[in-house]
Design a protein with these regions (language model features):
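Glycine-rich, acidic/polar active-site loops that bind/position phosphate-bearing ligands
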Residues: 1-208
Length: 208
């Protein structure tokens, strides 16, 4: 069951209730990179959920050749949720990718692969349910610069929490002068942990 809607009819009711202006159809490639197609809400009808949304799959790395580029996105209404960051009210809908040439789910679509794996688990009797627990860990940088030219290649990252900034004179703030050493940023409290408020905002946004 979806968190906000459980059917296509509920989807349109939910969009009307929240004055949704745009529908963002999303899918991922083989390495998990997000891709999307955005439609004006007024251009969407139930037929898009039944027949799908066409797109050019040759634009996705390692997917389709140009002569067989036409593919279909099948929206999953139960996956819909409001985008908390867009200026205009936008609803995000995850999609399955369908191969119109074979008349089946696309073998390079991660959602299709997961669904086939679940079906195999049940049909083989190995299990009836699979649980996935992604570990959401990432770094927050203030600046990332990359150079890849014929005469040089480098990257440079910066963060206020980096110990190389112990003596930096911050123009728009003050320097606490106390920072974790390399690999020393696990479990410290403020002021060493400067991301408390950011994490709290992320959690609250995810729970909405």
């Amino acid at each position: 069951m979806g968190k906000f809607v459980n059917s296509v009819d509920e989807f349109f009711d939910y969009c009307k209730e929240n004055e949704v202006a745009f529908v963002d159809f999303r899918f991922t490639d083989m390495i998990g990179t997000w891709h999307h197609i955005t439609y004006n809400m007024s251009a969407i009808n139930k037929g898009h959920f039944e027949e799908g949304v066409p797109f050019d799959a040759s634009s996705i790395d390692a997917w389709q050749p140009i002569e067989k580029s036409d593919m279909i996105l099948k929206p999953d209404a139960q996956s819909a949720f409001l985008d908390p960051f867009t200026a205009d009210s936008t609803i995000i809908v995850f999609c399955d990718v369908y191969d119109i040439y074979k008349g089946q789910m696309y073998e390079k679509c991660p959602r299709s692969i997961a669904k086939k794996a679940m079906e195999h688990l049940k049909n083989s009797g190995i299990a009836d349910t699979a649980y996935f627990g992604p570990e959401n860990e990432f770094f927050v940088f203030d600046s990332v610069r990359i150079v890849d030219n014929i005469h040089c290649a480098k990257y440079e990252i910066d963060t206020e929490e980096g110990d190389w900034n112990d003596d930096k004179d911050f123009v728009d703030g003050y320097n606490t002068g106390h920072r974790p050493r390399t690999k020393g940023g696990y479990f410290p409290v403020q002021p060493v942990d400067s991301m408390v408020d950011l994490r709290a905002e992320m959690v609250q946004t995810l729970e909405k």
